[in-house]
Amino acid sequence: MDQDRVPFSNTEPFRFCPADGTELEAKGGESRGAACPTCGRSWYRSSAPAVGAAIVDGERVLVTVRGIEPEKGRLDLPGGFVEVGEHPRDALAREAREELGVEVEVEQRPMLLAVHTYGPDGEYVLAMGFRVRIVSGEPNPADDVAKFRWVAADEIDGLDFAWEHDRRIARQALEDG
């Protein structure tokens, strides 16, 4: 898929105005939104924010094997989508509990912000990577994680990451340690 092409129309996911039910019209220009010709409100399809945890233990970082599509069987970092109204740090803690059964502490501000596409339709995602440490529990794969492993800095470049930004986050977390 052409990474520069937006894989949806200006009006998706809205076809009708949520306020009054009028069929929406694509806005012109750069906005890529949809407008209601009756009430004048604008609607936008937004990129989904996601978080990734570079869980560090000394000279190693934890990577997971995806148990589900997209990219099943490939490596990534624990994490996932931020829910509506959820702070990214809270999303990170929730994802670590869901995927590994551990409690984590975020050690710093986001290390990396990256825009990438996710899934077969190429939906855009804004990913935020954080360096974290486990404060309680032992990692145990759950949810969409098939298994995990600890890797050293010299192994990172040879691994099959699903998304390149996860490789950069893992590498930077060990360099910053």
Stretches with model-predicted labels:
Residues 4-7, 56-98:
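Conserved Nudix-box catalytic region and its N-terminal flanking loop in Nudix hydrolases
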Residues 1-13, 112-113, 170-177:
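A broadly conserved sequence feature marking short terminus-proximal activation segments
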Residues 6-52:
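Acidic, metal-coordinating catalytic segment for phosphate/diphosphate chemistry
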Residues 55, 63, 132-134, 150:
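Conserved hydrophobic "DFG−1" position in protein kinase catalytic cores
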Residues 57, 78-83, 127-131, 172-175:
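A short Gly-Trp-Pro
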Residues 140-170:
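NUDIX/MutT-family hydrolases
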Residues 101-138:
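Active-site segment of metal-dependent pyrophosphate-handling enzymes
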